A protein has these predicted regions:
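Extracytoplasmic copper-binding redox domains, predominantly the cupredoxin/blue-copper superfamily
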Residues: 2-14, 19-107
Length: 107
């Protein structure tokens, strides 16, 4: 195989691997409704995106207990977070501390 042919084959392999990795990532939706996260617990994989939609008329946050991320969701807006590591992630709303959620993230 020529050098050009080998380069093309490597390029195709890289593009396919990248596309497969992107295709496997999911978007998981959580609603902020009636001062609660719905669903309160979700399962995700590393690389998945969690999208919170604030359906309430007041602002909320999705704030990790370990303070590694803090998302402000204005009324009728969405915010998102890409899961970066496996494990249990507890989060809450800073404005409404009884509003709690959990992400169970796997590799």
């Amino acid at each position: 195989m020529s050098a050009v042919g080998k380069s093309a084959a490597v390029l195709v392999a890289v593009v396919c691997a990248t596309a497969a990795a992107q295709a496997s990532a999911a978007t998981i939706e959580v609603k902020m409704t009636n001062v609660a996260f719905e669903p309160a617990t979700v399962s995700a994989k590393v690389g998945d995106t969690i999208v919170w939609t604030n359906n309430d008329i007041v602002a909320h946050t999705a704030t990790s207990r370990d303070k590694s991320w803090d998302l402000n969701a204005l009324p009728k807006k969405t915010v998102s977070f890409v899961v970066k590591k496996a494990g249990g992630i507890e989060y809450y709303c800073r404005y409404h501390p009884n509003m709690v959620g959990h992400i169970e993230a796997k590799d």
